[in-house]
Amino acid sequence: MASMFAEREVLVMLDDNCIFCKIAAGEIPSETVYEDEQFRAILDLGPASAGHTLILPKAHFKDVTEISDEYAANVLKVAAKLGKAMKKGLGCEGFNLVQNNGEAAGQTVMHFHMHVIPRYAGGEDMVSWDPKPAKREELEKQGAKLREALED
């Protein structure tokens, strides 16, 4: 499938002040483990575990609400490739896909990116929460609000 963005258009979409745009464009050195026409995947400088990788689109999207359908579909294909490579090359037993949107959610660089984090036996538990039972009435209210918002 042809890219919906011509190369010239993608370059226009880069944010001159965005460090991830510069890394994705190859202007700042990084340990690149994968690259194609849409993405560059690099090892994280502050890894949660050995092999922690960031998938960076070469086009600038602030977060998942701005990413195009084509990029959204293809980022999961890249994540799957990386996950398989992590199992084969690094011997991890699993991996987490983490994608934060907005400061309140922990996004520190306002350029869409996905973390692929290898998980090893006996490794630190990093993705967890304390589930609390939900009340049926609250679920119904939240569900109605979300369905209404999805119709807009």
Q: What are the residue ranges of the model-derived segments?
A:
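HIT superfamily nucleotide-processing domains
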Residues: A2-D152
